[in-house]
């Protein structure tokens, strides 16, 4: 069975909702925690799902700090923003967030949702 964790930084609750929806699709008991409560080490997890909101064209400050601490071979990144999720700008935001991950981390997927 896959051992995963979902971590998120949320201001309005939208990313938290998405995080819990992701966790609901994973094996029962998969942790879903705020970045304030995330572990220091992710090596015991097969996969890490990391969520944040986009603030001024980049991951929010707490999200940035969390991404810098995440190192894993299988990381899926998800975000919300006030823009077209299919735009070049959204791609740039995700790319800049992925670049914050610890060196050697493997990104297995990304997702961005528009929020109002």
Where are these regions (language model features)?
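FMN-binding flavodoxin-like domain, especially the glycine-rich phosphate-binding loop
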Residues: 4, 25-33, 44-51, 55-116
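Detector for methionine-enriched segments
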Residues: 1-2, 38
């Amino acid at each position: 069975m896959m051992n995963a964790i979902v971590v998120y930084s949320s201001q309005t609750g939208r990313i938290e909702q998405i995080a819990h929806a992701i966790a609901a699709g994973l094996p029962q008991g998969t942790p879903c925690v705020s970045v304030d409560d995330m572990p220091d080490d992710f090596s015991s997890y097969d996969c890490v799902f990391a969520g944040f909101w986009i603030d001024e064209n980049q991951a929010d400050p707490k999200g940035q700090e969390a991404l810098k601490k995440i190192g894993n071979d299988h990381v899926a990144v998800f975000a919300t923003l006030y823009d077209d999720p299919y735009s070049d700008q959204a791609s740039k935001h995700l790319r800049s967030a992925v670049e914050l991950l610890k060196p050697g981390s493997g990104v297995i997927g990304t997702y961005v949702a528009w929020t109002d």
